């Protein structure tokens, strides 16, 4: 969550669009706000802001408590087993760290929405909190893409070099994702400022003369990097993996194929509504013209859509960890480890393989070394069930500037 999309020259709450000819006489934000103050409403939508704040407060609080517990458990269990980490554990561990970062930012967004976007935590935290959120949002999505690609490559690759260097590749990919995610938000964050007033607000404040261009560039980059590029990759590689695993007449195979399709469906349900709303509000007034009732509804429900997009940090631990019997075994071992010694025997695993934390869909090669006579050995597959969902709260569009 962050600053809401700017209405630019379009209508905000109870305000009509201003003719373009009138905007030619406007030279700064103060004059623009003054013009909107004297513009009459053409339509009015009766919506309860107080009810929305209560609902959002409850949702944010629930996501914070559940997400904090889930992601801490995932990190602890995977960290303890990092020495003998499974096929996808490095990506899962990093994704849990990114999701935990989003969860830790939820109290700030919860209070900001409750206080009607009044920012009480100073100028530094205004920028840092948004930057911290964006970094973790992009990281979570990118690690999800890597999981989808790596799963298919591991399933289909018989190359000895891949078997030898796959862990190095994964470490390099994880480091690269964190660096890339730290760079991507910078153009937006440098324009986020604390606007002082009776009720200080944390807003996206690009130069007035190029504000519409900046707002559109930020919205497009968010949608492209956060959805339009990850979505095809996640879809294609999960579908290819499902086709590879499909075995007619095998109920377990069908279940795992449906699970792979569920990964894609959850990602779409989390992020598509957010990015559609973000683009519509950003384009309105400058590139497209929306009916004022629709604009009112989009602004009103933007906070709710933004909140639901953050559900990925609560659902990811369930889909990629808790639905896996292997993870539950490791979690039980971790709990038993801290119990009195005379109670630990009942919780120990029969073998190390049964305790290893793996992705809900586990892909292993039949032989560690490819046979000379069989350059393309058939993979041996074992599965555990689970679901998916991506990030972020989303990168919020620029907030409508409504006078106090």
Swiss-Prot record:
Q: Where are the transmembrane segments?
A: 58-79, 91-113, 128-149, 171-193, 218-239, 259-280, 300-320
Q: What Gene3D superfamilies does the entry give?
A: Rhodopsin 7-helix transmembrane proteins (1.20.1070.10)
State the superkingdom: Eukaryota
Keywords per UniProt: Cell membrane, Disulfide bond, G-protein coupled receptor, Glycoprotein, Membrane, Receptor, Transducer, Transmembrane, Transmembrane helix
Query: Which molecular-function annotations from GO does this UniProt entry contain?
Result: G protein-coupled receptor activity; transmembrane signaling receptor activity
**Main location class:** membrane
For the Extracellular compartment, the record's topological domain ranges are: 1-57, 114-127, 194-217, 281-299
Residues carrying sugar? 28, 37
- Localization terms from the record: Cell membrane
According to its record, how does it sit in the membrane? Multi-pass membrane protein
Q: Does the keyword Cell membrane apply?
A: yes
Provide the tissue specificity. Highly expressed in heart, skeletal muscle, immune system, adrenal gland and liver.
For whether the record's keyword set contains tRNA-binding, the answer is no
The disulfide bridges present are 126-202
GO BP, sorted A to Z: cell surface receptor signaling pathway
Per the record, its GO cellular-component terms are: membrane; plasma membrane
* Family of the protein in this entry: Belongs to the G-protein coupled receptor 1 family.
**PANTHER family of this UniProt entry?**
G-PROTEIN COUPLED RECEPTOR 182 (PTHR24226:SF0), G-PROTEIN COUPLED RECEPTOR 182 AND ESTROGEN RECEPTOR 1 (PTHR24226)
Cited function = Orphan receptor.
The protein here is known as G-protein coupled receptor 182
Instruction: Tell me the lineage of the source organism.
Output: Eukaryota, Metazoa, Chordata, Craniata, Vertebrata
């Amino acid at each position: 969550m962050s600053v809401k999309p700017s209405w630019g020259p379009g209508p905000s709450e109870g305000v009509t669009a201003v003719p373009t000819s009138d905007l030619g006489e406007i030279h700064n934000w103060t004059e623009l706000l003054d013009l909107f103050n004297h513009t009459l409403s053409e339509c009015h939508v009766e919506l309860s802001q107080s009810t929305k704040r209560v609902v959002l407060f409850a949702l944010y609080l629930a996501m914070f408590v559940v997400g904090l517990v889930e992601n801490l458990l995932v990190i602890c269990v995977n960290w303890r087993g990092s020495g003998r980490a499974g096929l996808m554990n490095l990506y899962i561990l990093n994704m849990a760290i990114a999701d935990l970062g989003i969860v830790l930012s939820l109290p700030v967004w919860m209070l900001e929405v409750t206080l009607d976007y009044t920012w009480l935590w100073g100028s530094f935290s205004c920028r840092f909190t948004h930057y911290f959120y964006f970094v973790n949002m992009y990281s979570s999505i990118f690690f999800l893409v890597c999981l989808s690609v790596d799963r298919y490559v591991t399933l289909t690759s018989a190359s000895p070099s891949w078997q030898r260097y796959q862990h190095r590749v994964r470490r390099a990919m994880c480091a690269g994702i964190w660096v890339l995610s730290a760079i991507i938000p910078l153009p937006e964050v440098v324009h986020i400022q604390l606007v002082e007033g009776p009720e200080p607000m944390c807003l996206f404040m690009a130069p007035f003369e190029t504000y519409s261009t900046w707002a559109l560039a930020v919205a497009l980059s968010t949608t492209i990097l956060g959805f339009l590029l990850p979505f095809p990759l996640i879809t294609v590689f999960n579908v290819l993996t499902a086709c590879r695993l499909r075995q007619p007449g095998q109920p377990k195979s069908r279940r795992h194929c449906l699970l792979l399709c569920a990964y894609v469906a959850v990602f779409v349900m989390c992020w598509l509504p957010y990015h559609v709303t973000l683009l519509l509000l950003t384009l309105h007034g400058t590139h497209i013209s929306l009916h004022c009732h629709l604009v009112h509804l989009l602004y009103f429900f933007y906070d709710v859509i933004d909140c639901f997009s953050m559900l990925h940090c609560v659902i990811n631990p369930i889909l990629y960890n808790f639905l896996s019997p292997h993870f539950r075994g490791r979690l039980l071992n971790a709990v038993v480890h801290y119990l009195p010694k005379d109670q630990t025997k009942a919780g120990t695993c029969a073998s190390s393989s049964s305790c290893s934390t793996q992705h809900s869909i586990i892909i292993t090669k039949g032989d560690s070394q490819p046979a000379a006579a069989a350059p393309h050995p058939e993979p041996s597959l074992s599965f555990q069930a689970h679901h998916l969902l991506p990030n972020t709260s989303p990168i919020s569009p620029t907030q409508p500037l409504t006078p106090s």
